[in-house]
Amino acid sequence: MPLPTTQLRLAMVAGEPSGDLLAASLLGGLRERLPAPTHYYGIGGARMIAQGFDSHWQMDKLTVRGYVEALGQIPEILRIRGELKRQLLAERPDAFIGVDAPDFNFNVEQAARDAGIPSIHFVCPSIWAWRGGRIKKIAKSVDHMLCLFPFEPAILDKAGVASTYVGHPLADEIPLEPDTHGARIALGLPADGPVIAVLPGSRRSEIALIGPTFFAAMALMQQREPGLRFVMPAATPALRELLQPLVDAHPQLALTITDGRSQVAMTAADAILVKSGTVTLEAALLKKPMVISYKVPWLTGQIMRRQGYLPYVGLPNILAGRFVVPELLQHFATPEALADATLTQLRDDANRRTLTEVFTEMHLSLRQNTAAKAAEAVARVLDQRKRRA
């Protein structure tokens, strides 16, 4: 397929760590598919920067969760978005790629599209789960959608939105058979004996809301299973600092906190207690029994409940189309309930075998060589623009 011979400029925005991961994968594919040099710039995180991305703003300025929590950051986010749009319209890159962060990116994408700059969005918003009215905004803003999940293109096609199913980069990255023994050696954990990975989130608000409940659940589990060990990844020194008071309050826990390495920590585990989010898909790809939980402020929870369509929030259940792992949310997420459910996941060997089959099928479906497939879709959009010019 022909491509422009002059230097390309691609603007991109990722708004949170999961988007940084996806965008870095896409950048790796683009660097192989597109001619060098191509200038990639905009807003991104550490993984994107490691791929040669030129980030003009700090990604964490856009990282918020929930309606109530976002209110204090709205002025700063609007300022950054305004500056970004002015820059795009002045410099006119060959395309704009928004990676997730739909509430931020759709506005930018519509401005780019209205100005004749192709707009590509990576990660279809979960319009099939809640806020389905966003499909109208997508149709106005997006020239081409890169979809992580196989059922999404059919939904978009009905609204006249071009799309490509590219799979999920985590499915390419994670082996079909996880090396639990090797992960335990890497973390200095005993080869034998039960291990539970606990992931309470990475944001201050998440730790404040669910951290104490998770630690109380761990204490109950330790009482019932004295030989039980826990592993908890802390992505940053700041997160470790947030967790330290909870660690100090539970000195009896056989707990190992790792510096990052969340995937290794989950691989080492026999079961996982995890806050809802992309990490639940990672746990499924690692074939681990899990309990999914979250707590958000009351108002945020009410809005989410009223705008939701599905009875589940965890990606493993959404992709399976049924409850394959338990979810304990909001006031149902008590220490007792979390401890009971997690120990059941740990002990039930028949359930473990069933989950391995379900998660392996899921893994194979999502393993699509995402970086190359997404890069090829971007190249097609760029080529279409060249032919129209």
UniProtKB/Swiss-Prot annotation:
Organism expressing this protein natively:
Burkholderia multivorans (strain ATCC 17616 / 249)
The reply to whether Glycosyltransferase figures as a keyword in the UniProt entry is yes
Gene name in the database record: lpxB
Q: Which family does it belong to?
A: Belongs to the LpxB family.
Q: What biological processes does GO assign it?
A: lipid A biosynthetic process
So what does this thing catalyse?
A: a lipid X + a UDP-2-N,3-O-bis[(3R)-3-hydroxyacyl]-alpha-D-glucosamine = a lipid A disaccharide + UDP + H(+)
- Top enzyme class, one word, equals transferase
Q: What does this protein do?
A: Condensation of UDP-2,3-diacylglucosamine and 2,3-diacylglucosamine-1-phosphate to form lipid A disaccharide, a precursor of lipid A, a phosphorylated glycolipid that anchors the lipopolysaccharide to the outer membrane of the cell.
| Source lineage | Bacteria, Pseudomonadati, Pseudomonadota, Betaproteobacteria, Burkholderiales
> GO MF terms on file?
lipid-A-disaccharide synthase activity; phospholipid binding
Cellular component, GO annotation: membrane
Q: Which domain of life is it from?
A: Bacteria
Task: Please give the name of this protein.
Answer: Lipid-A-disaccharide synthase
As recorded in UniProt, its EC number(s) are 2.4.1.182
